[in-house]
From Swiss-Prot:
Protein name: Serine/threonine-protein kinase PknB
Membrane topology, record value: Single-pass membrane protein
Assembly information from the UniProt record: Homodimer.
Role summary: Protein kinase that regulates many aspects of mycobacterial physiology. Is a key component of a signal transduction pathway that regulates cell growth, cell shape and cell division via phosphorylation of target proteins.
PTM remark: Autophosphorylated. Dephosphorylated by PstP.
Extracellular side: 350-622
Topological domains, Cytoplasmic: 1-328
Xref: CDD domains: PASTA_pknB (cd06577), STKc_PknB_like (cd14014)
Active site: D138 (proton acceptor)
BP term (GO), one: regulation of primary metabolic process
Lineage: Bacteria, Bacillati, Actinomycetota, Actinomycetes, Mycobacteriales
GO cellular component entries: plasma membrane
Residues annotated as binding Mg(2+): N143, D156
NCBIfam families registered for this protein in UniProt: PknB_PASTA_kin
Length: 622
């Protein structure tokens, strides 16, 4: 199987950026969002292995849940259809930068302050992942990038777990390749927790400070042995310029016993910040040669004084004894595993076949179940089946079943859940809610809820869509949201008087109105100014209504009050306001002697708008 040049009609694959234990990473172009991304694709030779296939998919989901500025973001996951079957991939943030491994190999050790800042950011990323239940398991300089803007980015969350949990012999090299950063518990094959990542990050800090990892050997086995048995040389003895306070932080992170390490990455970060600001860390100070000489000379000159170091030595001996017991337990465990393997081989090839009880692995992760069965000497094969109650990648049952007695070396079929059965969501558009539920139920779906959304008047009370949408596949246990039209959305018309047309339309857009017409009206307001709307302001109408904007022609002036004025005075005043029309002189009226020849009546009245070429009627007193 080869990797196709396009994935899901969206991602154009470019150059290969690198290879991992189970994947290859390509530079790619997201043609939908027009941005560069990095795409991790499961290796073609592993895509047909159900264990790797399911674990890669699950780890992709875990990684996508980690949204943190110091963690390479996961944008999308999916599967590309190839001639040989589905090929899963993960779409990630493309980081333009270099890994710590490349930086140290090119430039050598980093200044302590810079190293502290980088690892402190990495601590934040790891602490966030631990709080979300994800252990990295493969912290190393190659998995920490520094971007072109000096941002720290931790990569490959969870992928190392897929390799470490696998029983495939072909993956041995992938584990050995990171032996220089394995925690002692990883090297012994014990279960690990967040403190294992703290140890590995301590190895990273050691290397970027000194230019070399804490342990170097001729083979991965010898390096792993040193992680379990040997104490690291303090970084300050490997490279100058490193303070004893920073030594203390590194060596506490590299404690053999997890109980003696930082219990969280946040604790390690807090000590790094203390050292960065010139304060002593909480980690115990590492004695220099001068300190030891001073203590010895002090002890020689105080004969007869009670020795407190005897108790310390005794405690240390007890600790070492405990460590020795732990190492013997590990040796015994290894011998036990070898014994089981030898017995299984004898039963298979050289002796009589014996019956072995099938362990109960129901509900376990498939990779763990495979290990448990193969440790009993069984051959295994996996069969994927949908199941509505067992989570994906977990065991539904085995054939033969749990506790059955079968011959050693027989094949056990492991039925692995792919999650609930997937069905295509039918199109229920334009149906009412009841009929839509009936159609969805007939397609196998069981849970529904209604949501209302604005619609055209014709679709009021009708289905306008579903979530997931029609023709998409969904688990039959998922809740299908049926979206029912509630008719046109209504809004209150805002007051836009006094605004020019363009501004008025933008303000109406904010309220959801998008349809407009204009009507020019006589008005003394400036030309082009909105003097009103139809429907009027504050009216509540559907947002798809046409809003008429009444726009001033600017062809009027405001009629002044001419009462008591002689015509000789009134006319110049009107002309000054732009009036070009003619006077309609009405019959004189009886207004008393004092109003003789003065304006006693006018039309239009004072304050009204008058067209500049309009007729004005005046009546004078007699």
């Amino acid at each position: 199987m080869t990797t196709p040049p396009h994935l899901s009609d969206r991602y154009e694959l470019g150059d290969i950026l690198g290879f991992g234990g189970m994947s290859e990473v390509h530079l790619a172009r997201d043609i939908r969002l027009h941005r560069d991304v990095a795409v991790k694709v499961l290796r073609a030779d592993l895509a047909r292995d159900p264990s790797f296939y399911l674990r890669f998919r699950r780890e992709a989901q875990n990684a996508a849940a980690l949204n943190h500025p110091s963690i390479v973001a996961v944008y999308d996951t999916g599967e590309a259809e190839t001639s040989a079957g589905p090929l899963p991939y993960i779409v990630m943030e493309y980081v333009d930068g270099a890994t710590l491994r490349d930086i140290v190999h090119t430039d050598g050790p980093m200044p302590p302050q810079q190293a502290i800042e980088i690892v402190a950011d990495a601590c934040q990323a790891l602490n966030f992942s631990h709080q979300n239940g994800i252990i990295h398991r493969d912290v190393k300089p190659a998995n920490i990038m520094i971007s072109a803007t000096n941002a720290v980015k931790v990569m490959d969350f969870g992928i190392a777990r897929a390799i470490a949990d696998s029983t495939s012999v072909t993956q041995t090299a992938a584990v050995i390749g990171t032996a220089q950063y394995l925690s002692p518990e990883q090297a012994r094959g014990d279960s690990v927790d967040a403190r294992s990542d703290v140890y590995s990050l301590g190895c990273v800090l050691y290397e970027i400070l000194t230019g070399e990892p804490p342990f170097i050997g001729d083979s991965p086995v010898s390096v792993a042995y040193q992680h379990v048995r040997e104490d690291p040389i303090p970084p300050s003895q490997r490279h100058e310029g490193i303070s004893v306070d920073l030594d203390a932080v590194v060596l506490k992170a590299l404690a053999k016993n997890p109980e003696n390490r930082y219990q969280t990455a946040a604790e390690m970060r807090a000590d790094l910040i203390r050292v960065h600001s010139g304060q002593p860390p909480e980690a115990p100070k590492v004695l220099t040669d001068a300190d030891r000489s001073c203590l010895l000379s002090s002890g020689a000159g105080n004969f007869g004084v009670p020795r407190t170091d005897a108790l310390s030595r005794q405690s240390l001996d007890e600790t070492e004894s405990d460590g020795s017991i732990g190492r013997w337990v590990a040796v015994v465990a290894v011998l036990a595993v070898l014994t089981i393997a030898i017995v299984a081989a004898f039963n298979t090839f050289g002796g009589n076949t014996r019956d072995v009880q099938v362990p109960d692995v129901r509900g376990q992760v498939s990779a763990d179940a495979i290990s448990a069965l193969q440790n009993r000497g069984f051959k295994t094969r996996t069969l994927q089946k949908p199941d509505s109650t067992i989570p994906p990648d977990h065991v539904i049952s085995t054939e033969p079943g749990a506790n059955a007695s079968v011959g050693a070396g027989d094949e056990i079929t492991i039925n692995v859940s792919t999650g609930p059965e997937q069905r295509e969501v039918p199109d229920v558009s334009s149906l009412n809610y009841t009929d839509a539920v009936k159609k969805l139920t007939s397609s196998g779906f069981k849970s529904f809820k209604q949501a209302n959304s604005p619609s055209t008047p014709e679709l009021l009370g009708k289905v306008i869509g579903t979530n997931p949408s029609a023709n998409q596949t969904s688990a039959i246990t998922n809740v299908i949201t049926i979206i029912v039209g509630s008719g046109p959305e209504t809004k209150q018309i805002p007051d836009v008087t006094g605004q020019i047309v363009e501004i008025a339309q933008k303000n109406l857009n904010v309220y959801g109105f998008t349809k407009f017409s204009q009507a020019s009206v006589d008005s003394p307001r400036p030309t082009g100014e909105v003097i009103g709307t139809n429907p009027p302001k504050d009216a509540t109408v559907p947002v798809d209504s046409v809003i008429e904007l009444q726009v001033s022609k600017g062809n009027q002036f405001v009629m002044p009050d001419l009462s008591g004025m002689f015509w000789a005075d009134a006319e110049p005043r009107l002309r000054a306001l732009g009036w070009t029309g003619v006077l309609d002189k009405g019959p004189d009226v009886d207004a008393g002697g004092s109003q003789h020849n003065r304006v006693a009546y006018q039309n239009p009245p004072a304050g009204a708008g008058v067209n500049r070429d309009g007729i004005i009627t005046l009546k004078f007193g007699q």
